[in-house]
């Protein structure tokens, strides 16, 4: 299974890019690497719950609705 690694940079939908700062078994703490339409504050740290997609890779949803952007550990 592909997992998020601390220090890794991952690109999601709509060219959203994040850098993983910390990781636990169930959550990751990250910041955005560049401004984007979703979030302009790139210095703020965010924490989201990790979800598993078909045991192939980990993913996080950036919003609370299924249609909002997500980032996968590829």
Regions found by a protein language model. Give the residues of each.
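Intrinsically disordered, low-complexity, charged/polar segments
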Residues: 37-74
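Short beta-strand-centered aromatic/proline hotspots
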Residues: 16-23
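Residue-level signal for tight coil/turn positions that link beta-strands
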Residues: 24-25, 54
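His-enriched metal-coordination microenvironments in redox/metal-binding proteins
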Residues: 10-15, 71-74
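Basic/aromatic-rich interaction segments and small domains that mediate binding to polyanionic partners
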Residues: 25-39
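Hydrophobic beta-strand residues in large extracellular and virion-surface proteins
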Residues: 18, 28-30, 48
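Short coil-to-beta transition motif at edge beta-strands of beta-rich domains
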Residues: 1-12
